[in-house]
Regions:
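Short proline/glycine-enriched turn/loop motifs at strand-loop junctions of beta-rich domains
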Residues: 421-428
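Short, glycine-anchored, charge-dense loop/turn motifs used at functional sites
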Residues: 430-438, 456
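C-terminal tail/sorting-segment detector
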Residues: 454-473
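Short strand-coil-strand connectors
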Residues: 77, 424, 461-465
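Extracellular, repeat-based ectodomains that mediate carbohydrate processing or recognition
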Residues: 26-396
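Bacterial Sec-dependent N-terminal signal peptides
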Residues: 1-30, 397
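Residue-level detector of functionally pivotal "anchor" positions at catalytic/ligand-binding pockets or at interdomain
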Residues: 251, 392-418, 470
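Glycine-centered tight-turn motifs at strand-turn-strand junctions
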Residues: 415-416, 437-453
Length: 473
């Protein structure tokens, strides 16, 4: 199924609707065989992948117990070198995959943020490499004299290549803390509040800090009376965080912390795409889109609306018009799913594939980066206690030429009771905005959709042609 063309219709006295059909094409991903990033001796906890300035994949992975530590494995000429232990500290918090260390890249600089276990106030650290991850300096404590919690640092770089950190500040209430690096002091400045415009902060959900065109951004799971939606916060200077918008229409209410965050990427047209898990209708993975130029929320949808299995831990990346998403799915065993689209996030569902099918054991916690030529995927292989790396390529496209309006086989109109679709016989699926399937079936000549005061997605399919209508009261 596909939601390639979303058309918003607004009822006043009537409804106005513009429709463009699309012919559906499915991109193909081809994969090399998985390889071990390192041996079991170096662990597979909290896996993250990024590319350094040379374009080489770097995989961050941690180990608890014997040989505990935080390691970076770098691929050069198709081979991963020996893991580099980036800090001497061994008591690193690696027990929550979503809450674990983070990695950021700026030119030849690579930064990793991490938390020392049981040192919730002073244990947040950032360590930096100046040579694409090969050697590492002394770590910086982000709040060495703090007396209140500074938990789960998420490091990012600003446009000048200086690190800054978003984290969870304090307990009951918890705020989003922002800390900037001060070059004069060679240390991080004290935390400032980055959540003044949000309805509370989810106390153990990781931050998602990043920069784009001089702006500072952070995607935060909020907590407003146990409504735990994701919000995008923004600041022009990293100090004044008075802009925030709700980017999550799933409206998940839960009275415990779900300990999950987002993965985000900015497309070539300035659209921010974020991927996240919500469990308002079972644990599923979703996408959300925002126009950063106008700071306007656009849409939310389920990555694979037809799926009925539990999903979690999405990762997303883009280059040019292409968007690549990876996540885990639990259908008896855990497997890693991947989807790609050059027609927006709505078309991801057309290419969903299980890339670990046939491998023994559970394969979980994927991290993906796409460089415009290759998909670089790292994930946790539980059976062997290692990180696997997969390299893939995309061929084909998610969308071919549009259908001219006069060739459109369906028209839609409205009245006080709902919507009326007329045209060629076809199958249809009705979704809510969270991607939940409400109704499926076939119709002959005419279909009536009742107005229940909720926004709906109507998808109509005949052979390879798909039209999708967004129906808004």
């Amino acid at each position: 199924m596909s939601k390639l063309c979303y058309m918003k219709t607004i009822i006043t006295l009537g409804m106005f609707c513009l429709v463009l059909g699309t012919l559906v094409a499915q991109p193909t991903m081809t994969w090399e065989s998985p390889i071990d990033v390192s041996s079991e001796e170096f662990g597979n906890r909290c896996t993250r992948i990024a590319l350094n300035q040379a374009g080489n994949p770097m995989v961050l992975h941690g180990k608890t117990g014997d040989n505990a530590g935080l390691y970076l494995s770098i691929m050069e000429n198709g081979i991963f070198g020996d893991p580099i232990q980036i800090v001497s500290e061994t008591n690193i918090y690696l027990f929550g995959e979503s809450e674990g260390p983070r990695m950021a890249v700026y030119e030849n600089r690579v930064a990793v943020s991490y938390q020392i276990f049981n040192e919730w106030a002073t244990g947040g650290h950032v360590v930096i490499s100046e040579d694409n991850g090969h050697t590492w300096g002394e770590p910086y404590a982000v709040a060495p004299t703090a007396t209140e919690d500074h938990f789960m640092p998420h490091v990012a770089f600003n446009d000048d290549g200086l690190p800054w950190v978003a984290l969870k500040l304090g307990v009951d209430p918890t705020e989003e803390g922002i800390l900037h690096f001060n070059t004069d002091l060679d240390a991080f400045d004290p935390a400032i509040s980055g959540s003044t415009a949000t309805p509370g902060v989810c106390e153990c959900c990781p931050s998602n800090a990043f920069g784009y065109e001089g702006m500072y951004y952070n995607v935060v799971r909020t907590n407003g009376d146990n409504l735990r939606d994701f919000w995008l916060t923004a600041s022009p200077d990293g100090v004044n965080w008075d802009s925030a918008i709700d980017i999550d229409e799933t409206d998940w209410v839960i009275n415990a912390c779900p300990a999950s965050g987002t993965s985000s990427t900015v497309m070539e047209d300035g659209t921010l795409i974020s991927a996240y898990m919500s469990a308002s209708n079972g644990s599923r993975v979703y996408w959300s889109s925002v126009d950063l130029s106008t700071f306007t929320f656009l849409e939310t949808g389920q990555i694979d609306p037809s799926n009925t299995f539990s999903e979690n831990h999405p990762s997303i990346s883009s280059s040019g018009a292409w968007l690549v998403a990876a996540w885990e799915r639990n259908s008896d065993d855990y497997n890693v799913m991947v989807a790609a689209s050059n027609a927006g996030p709505q078309a991801l569902e057309m290419s969903v594939v299980n890339v670990t099918e046939g491998l023994s054991g559970n394969n979980r916690h994927p991290s993906v980066v796409y460089d415009g030529e290759h998909i670089h995927l790292a994930y946790q292989n539980a059976e062997n206690g290692v990180v696997h790396y997969l390299k893939g390529e995309i061929s084909g496209a998610s969308q071919v030429e549009g259908v001219e309006i006069e060739e459109n086989p369906w028209t839609i109109s409205s009245n006080e009771s709902g919507w009326i679709l007329k045209g060629e016989d076809a199958s249809y699926t009705l979704y809510d905005l969270g991607g939940r399937t409400l109704e499926t079936g076939k119709f002959l000549n005419e279909l009536h959709i009742s107005n229940n005061n909720k926004a709906l997605i109507l998808q109509v399919r005949k052979n390879d042609q798909v039209n999708t209508f967004k129906l808004v009261k």
